[in-house]
Amino acid sequence: MKVLGIETSCDDCCIAVVENGIHILSNIKLNQKEHKKYYGVVPEIASRLHTEAIMSVCIKALKKANTKISEIDLIAVTSRPGLIGSLIVGLNFAKGLAISLKKPIICIDHILAHLYAPLMSSKIEYPFISLLLSGGHTLIAKQKNFDDVEILGKTLDDSCGEAFDKVAKHYNMGFPGGPNIEQISKNGDENTFKFPVTTFRKKENWYDFSYSGLKTACIHQLEKFKSKDNPTTKNNIAASFQKAAFENLITPLRRAIKDTQINKLVIAGGVASNLYLREKINKLKIQTYYPPLDLCTDNGAMIAGLGFNMYLKYGESPIETDVNSRIENYKNQYRRRK
């Protein structure tokens, strides 16, 4: 079965063709560079650019896959969570294709798709612990199947990727913040500033994260946390911030691994491409899986791959399915399917 996967939840216009949930025939992505001068994604600009680009991206994906549109068996599309305007462009495009081609459509949860992505490159037996790190989400999950996901912990304020973006914006390091800070930090001393690392002691927040304190310390209280007589350079700020940002993840992650007795870890999301993070995670000395770099960030392949499995198990989505920008009752919603 050939699945067309459409992902437009934020600023990347992504369309892929995947066969039988795992064989990637094409995986086309168009980055919207127009947001760089704003140091963040402007929703109105994102949706307009999706509208302008989505047809050409689809044509490129089909051509790369050597597949005619009539040979597509299923259309999978992100319907939540994300920017409303961007989601609408992708969903309406998918609905138009489904109706005109008389093909089934399956609406996909963006978070579940990120958690599925590592399975497209590695054979991983359930259960395992997943760590999702992206511009919009930071969470730890226990996975028993592609559709049986229990959120153990999440960020209580900024996501990890969002904190990187805000620090990078303040110090003019470029957008997106993650890859720019990673590059700039290579020539810095990570011990110049000793930024705070947040861990929670209450049971209800045992696996949760917080990045607001670290962000405030780095942007507004920089000199207060200086621990070495090194110059206050962008390189040293970037290196010290990156170190603290990833140390913020380690304690909740250790707790989740210990409490669940699950010794397999899957890392997903755009921040998972950070090589410094991978060094930190590898020190945990447990079996760890990373998706290839093109499956870390937003992509259509993960939508198509998960869509294939969801369709086989649950069938097609109602054509009237709408978009949703958020997940209400966040921690509990992901156990909705049994």
From Swiss-Prot:
Gene Ontology cellular-component terms for this entry are: cytoplasm
Task: Please give the cofactor(s) recorded in the UniProt entry for this protein.
Answer: Fe(2+)
Q: Does the entry feature the keyword Iron, yes or no?
A: yes
Which superkingdom heads the taxonomic lineage of this protein's source? Bacteria
The cofactor note from the UniProt entry for this protein is: Binds 1 Fe(2+) ion per subunit.
Q: Which Pfam families match?
A: TsaD
Residues given in the record as Fe cation binding sites: H110, H114, D298
Q: Where does substrate bind?
A: L132, L133, S134, G135, G136, D165, G178, N274
What main location does UniProt list? Answer: cytoplasm
Catalytic activities: L-threonylcarbamoyladenylate + adenosine(37) in tRNA = N(6)-L-threonylcarbamoyladenosine(37) in tRNA + AMP + H(+)
Its function, per the record, reads:
Required for the formation of a threonylcarbamoyl group on adenosine at position 37 (t(6)A37) in tRNAs that read codons beginning with adenine. Is involved in the transfer of the threonylcarbamoyl moiety of threonylcarbamoyl-AMP (TC-AMP) to the N6 group of A37, together with TsaE and TsaB. TsaD likely plays a direct catalytic role in this reaction.
Q: Which family does it belong to?
A: Belongs to the KAE1 / TsaD family.
Q: What is this protein called?
A: tRNA N6-adenosine threonylcarbamoyltransferase
Q: What is the lineage of its organism?
A: Bacteria, Pseudomonadati, Spirochaetota, Spirochaetia, Spirochaetales
